[in-house]
């Protein structure tokens, strides 16, 4: 658990009620003193740690709750929704997200061959992990660099290396290593998710994705669901609906036009699935 003192020190040096892109590479912080929802984001490979408050994440039909003792590990790009139900000025919500630098993790494994054991062990992908004291301390030191920005250039990368080391040597090490290990299920599924993001508005069969990943059809489907918490169809549908919402809400496109542009053949089916996913009809997002 992060101390009240640490939270107060951070709140003095980061912007309030917005997503803050830190000068520390790959690090983002989000503060809020009121509840809010995020209805469609692509979470890149990262760890996300709630410093204060609680966060709910929705993946398909599953809901995960994260607090300051349990953090989120996202090994591949995953579309997700979420909600912060409780936040107020006296008890604000504060979360950090740190993108995982695959190259840095690979270098640590190359320099320490003994860490490369049991790469496949517990290869389950998206996960909720306990935040142990050694990892918490490293994260705390990284965040408090914001008090002395001149230290960031030299110290931030060193502390991030320590964070990767703690993840590699912790109880979750096998799953974390699978991200960067050639031949691991996580690495293969990452290829499929990348392809889906590039071709989400096309008709794609699961057989095509399985062949692309070099896996059997049944094996691919099983591991895709384990690693992303979504089926391939749910994953593609999430990408389509999120892009459609952006087209409607931000670009002012018509509902039917957006439906066809993201790959739907039936506007009525699109409207039904949009309402089921976001909780309201597409017209609720029109300008």
Predicted regions and their residues:
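A generic hydrophobic-segment detector
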Residues: 113-143, 259-263, 270, 277, ...
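Residues that scaffold the ATP/ADP-binding catalytic core of kinase and kinase-like folds
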Residues: 82, 108, 166, 235, ...
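N-terminal regulatory/effector-sensing and dimerization cores
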Residues: 19-117
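Short, Lys/Arg-enriched, Trp-marked, Pro/Gly-tolerant hinge/linker segments that flank
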Residues: 117-133, 145-202, 207-213, 226-234, ...
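Short hydrophobic/aromatic patch on the recognition helix
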Residues: 69, 220-224, 269-270, 274
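A short, N-terminal "cap"/entry segment at the start of jelly-roll beta-barrel domains
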Residues: 1-23, 36, 119-123, 145
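Terminal helix-turn-helix DNA-binding modules in bacterial transcription factors
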Residues: 193-198, 202-215, 225-268, 280, ...
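Amphipathic, well-ordered alpha-helical segments in soluble domains
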Residues: 46-49, 104, 134, 138, ...
């Amino acid at each position: 658990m992060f101390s009240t003192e640490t939270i107060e020190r951070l709140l003095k040096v980061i912007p309030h009620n917005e997503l803050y892109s830190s000068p520390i590479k790959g690090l983002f912080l989000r503060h809020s003193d009121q509840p809010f929802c995020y209805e469609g984001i692509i979470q890149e490979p990262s760890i996300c740690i709630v410093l204060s408050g609680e966060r709910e994440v929705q993946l398909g039909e599953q809901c995960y709750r994260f607090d300051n003792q349990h953090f989120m590990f996202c090994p591949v790009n995953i579309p997700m929704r979420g909600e912060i139900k409780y936040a107020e000025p006296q008890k604000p919500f504060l979360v950090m997200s740190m993108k995982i630098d695959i190259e840095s993790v690979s270098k640590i494994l190359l320099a320490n061959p003994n860490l490369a054991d049991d790469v496949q062990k517990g290869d389950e992908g998206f996960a909720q992990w306990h935040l142990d004291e050694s990892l918490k301390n490293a994260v705390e030191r990284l965040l408090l660099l914001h008090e002395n920005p001149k230290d960031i250039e030299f110290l931030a990368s060193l502390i991030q290396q320590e964070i990767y080391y703690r993840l590699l040597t912790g109880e979750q090490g096998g799953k974390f290593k699978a991200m960067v290990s050639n031949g691991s299920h996580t690495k293969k599924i990452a290829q499929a998710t990348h392809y889906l993001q590039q071709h989400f508005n096309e008709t794609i069969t699961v057989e095509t994705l399985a062949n692309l990943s070099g896996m059997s059809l049944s094996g691919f489907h099983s591991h895709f669901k384990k690693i992303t918490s979504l089926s391939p169809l749910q994953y593609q549908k999430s990408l389509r609906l999120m892009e459609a919402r952006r087209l409607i809400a931000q670009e002012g496109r018509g509902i039917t036009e957006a439906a066809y542009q993201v790959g739907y053949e039936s506007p009525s089916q699109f409207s039904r699935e949009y309402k089921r996913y976001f909780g309201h009809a597409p017209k609720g997002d029109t300008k």
